[in-house]
C-alpha cells in the first residue's frame, strides 16, 4: 500500500472508501473520487427541494459515477425516486453498491447510457443534477498525478472546450 501511495494512487482508492456529506461511499478506479466541490451542488439542490416542499420528487443524476449525488439525494428525501445514469457499466455497478450500503437501493433506478439516451422519452423529473466531464482535454495532463494518472479519463475529459457533454 505504501508503494501504491508513493506512485500517486489516491488514498481513497487504496482504502476503497470516501466520505461524502456524512455518508460513506465505496470508490475504485472506475469512478471519480467524490469531492467537496460536488457537495456544494448537492447542498444547493437539497435547499431548493426543501424550499419548494416537494414531498416525493423525481430526481435524475446523470453521469452518476460512484452515485454520490443520487444516493445522497435519495438519503435526504426518503420519498424521492432517484434515477441514476452513466455511460460506464462499471461506474453504474459501483453506484448500485453504494445505494445498497446506504440503504436507498429500492428507491433508485439505474440506467446505462450516454446522458439522456438512457432515459425513456416519457419520463419527467422535478430536478436534474449532473457533474459531467468538464475538464478541457489539453488541461488534463497539467493535473496532479493522482488525478491524471489514476482517475478515469472518461469521467474527466470534457473535450476541447470542456463542454462536450452539454454541446451534444
Model-found features: residue ranges?
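Short glycine/threonine-rich catalytic loop with a Thr-x-Gly-x-Asp
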Residues: 34, 65-66, 162
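Conserved AdoMet
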Residues: 1-48
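Proline-centered helix-kink/hinge sites
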Residues: 10, 34, 132-133, 152
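Mobile active-site "lid"/loop adjacent to the S-adenosyl-L-methionine
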Residues: 134-165
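Cytosolic-biased juxtamembrane loops and peripheral soluble domains of multi-pass membrane proteins
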Residues: 17, 22, 87-90, 107, ...
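A general structural signal for well-ordered alpha-helical segments in protein cores
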Residues: 8-11, 66, 70, 153, ...
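Conserved SAM/SAH cofactor-binding pocket of Class I
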Residues: 40-142
Amino acid at each position: 500500500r505504501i508503494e501504491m501511495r508513493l506512485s500517486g494512487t489516491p488514498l481513497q482508492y487504496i482504502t476503497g472508501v470516501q466520505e461524502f456529506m456524512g455518508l460513506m461511499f465505496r470508490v475504485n478506479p472506475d469512478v471519480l473520487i467524490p469531492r467537496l466541490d460536488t457537495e456544494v451542488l448537492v447542498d444547493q439542490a437539497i435547499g431548493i427541494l426543501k424550499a419548494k416542499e416537494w414531498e416525493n420528487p423525481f430526481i435524475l443524476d446523470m453521469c452518476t459515477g460512484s452515485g454520490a449525488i443520487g444516493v445522497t439525494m435519495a438519503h435526504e428525501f426518503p420519498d424521492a425516486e432517484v434515477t441514476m445514469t452513466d455511460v460506464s457499466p462499471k461506474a453504474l455497478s459501483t453506484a448500485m453498491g453504494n445505494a445498497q450500503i446506504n440503504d436507498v437501493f429500492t428507491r433508485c433506478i439505474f440506467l446505462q447510457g450516454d446522458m439522456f439516451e438512457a432515459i425513456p422519452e416519457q419520463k419527467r423529473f422535478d430536478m436534474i443534477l449532473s457533474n459531467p466531464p468538464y475538464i478541457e482535454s489539453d488541461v488534463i495532463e497539467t493535473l496532479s498525478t493522482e488525478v491524471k494518472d489514476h482517475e478515469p479519463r472518461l469521467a474527466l475529459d470534457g473535450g476541447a472546450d470542456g463542454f462536450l457533454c452539454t454541446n451534444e
